[in-house]
Swiss-Prot record:
Gene3D superfamilies: Aldolase class I (3.20.20.70)
The protein's name: Probable RNA methyltransferase Daro_1157
GO cellular component: cytoplasm
Residues noted as binding S-adenosyl-L-methionine in the record, renumbered to the chain: 153-154, 183, 206-208, 282
UniProt organism field: Dechloromonas aromatica (strain RCB)
Gene Ontology biological-process annotations: rRNA base methylation; tRNA methylation
Taxon lineage: Bacteria, Pseudomonadati, Pseudomonadota, Betaproteobacteria, Rhodocyclales
Length: 357
């Protein structure tokens, strides 16, 4: 269901925009309808026809997304397995410090080799209403002031729904525009469309390598944009919006954790309005990748800091509860052990010298 469909159903009752806005504001903020009203009963500010239709509408909204299971993590996060109305499931993650990560697709077409979400390809799009419903579920559990579109799926492949959800959360949900984060592997449409929106979100860009050939192997179906050009496009967005770009880099042992790669980061990001988020890989039994040692992660972080690159280390939230993207859903679906054809080999992914000397 699209959010515009919800508006149209209320408009069909004769409701005016001010009435529709009131209902959307209450829903997206997970508050009672009378919350904040000068006159506290709905009959004082909503027309009779809309009040009559509200119970059925509220039931329909509640059915958009339900929590099938909740898995608190030791880091203060809580991973939610969310069941949609058709029985499909997605993951949402309540993050420390009032954040929420939501999913935009069931499956993913990009096929990042280190990610569980895309192993079966794209199953279907998540609608704008289903995205907002994930936020409503999260707000029913704790305070949410920041939403990142960084869960299952590639937001640029579901652009209309994602932008509609962002507009609704920024307009009615009480979330600051810079606290709505659009995450992407890099798609030219992102840089064209996002700055034109009423609600302009911050941008997170999945980089993972500064070498075009390695990045193409790690992200086989991402748009083929050279990392240098990608960073230039992102820098223009950062300067236009005033929001720093959050670069994401999944650190994989022996693949993209060499000092040569760090020098590539320095080359691309020096002088840029940017934050580099190093995300140590969250190991799974079905993918042949490893997480670098804590000592090596610390060495890389210090190296980038010394070169003037603002860097953070962000572990996947809820690592003790299948914290990597798509892992909880995969476990729930009882995927089992990967076949030889499914198991990813590292031999063809060549990396540079790893020494920090």
């Amino acid at each position: 269901m699209r959010l515009e469909t919800i508006r149209q159903s209320m408009r069909a009752t004769g409701a005016k925009d001010c009435h529709i806005d009131r209902v959307l504001r209450a829903w997206t903020q997970a508050k009672p309808l009378e919350s904040g009203a000068r006159r506290h009963q709905p009959e004082n500010f909503l027309p009779q026809a809309l009040r009559t239709a509200l119970p059925a509408l509220q039931e329909e909204l509640s059915a958009l997304a339900r929590v099938r299971s909740e898995h608190p993590g030791e880091d203060g996060s809580s991973r939610l397995l969310v069941e949609l109305a058709d029985g499909q499931t997605v993951e949402s993650v309540l993050l420390p410090r009032d954040g929420l990560c939501i999913s935009t697709q069931i499956g993913c077409a990009v096929g990042c080799t280190f990610c569980m979400t895309g192993r079966d390809g794209l199953l279907r799009q998540v609608s704008s209403a289903e995205m907002v419903a994930q936020v409503v579920l999260g707000r029913g559990r704790r305070k949410v002031t920041r939403v990142v579109f960084m869960g299952m799926g590639e937001p640029s492949h579901n652009m209309d729904n994602v932008l509609e959800a962002i507009d609704t959360l920024g307009t009615y949900g009480g979330i600051g525009h810079k606290n709505l984060v659009f995450s992407t592997v890099g798609d030219r449409r992102v840089f064209d469309r996002l700055p034109q929106q009423r609600v302009v979100p911050a941008l997170a860009l999945s980089l993972h390598s500064t070498r075009a050939e390695l990045r193409a192997e790690l992200l086989p179906k991402a748009p083929h944009i050279d990392p240098t050009e990608l960073v230039e496009l992102a820098e223009h967005y950062a300067r236009t919006t005033g929001y720093p770009i959050q670069y994401q880099w999944t650190l994989i042992d022996g693949i993209n954790d060499s000092i040569e790669e760090m020098d590539g980061i320095v080359r691309l990001l020096t002088g840029k309005y940017a934050i580099m988020n190093l995300i140590p890989y969250n190991a799974t039994a079905t993918l042949d990748y490893r997480r670098p040692s804590l000592e090596h992660i610390t060495t890389l972080t210090k190296y980038l800091h010394a070169k003037g690159i603002r860097t953070t280390v962000r572990n996947s939230a809820g690592q003790d509860v299948d914290g990597g993207c798509g892992q909880l859903r995969a476990r729930t679906l009882d995927a089992g052990t990967a076949t030889d054809a499914q198991k990813i080999s590292l031999k063809h992914l060549k990396t540079g010298t790893r020494s920090a000397a």
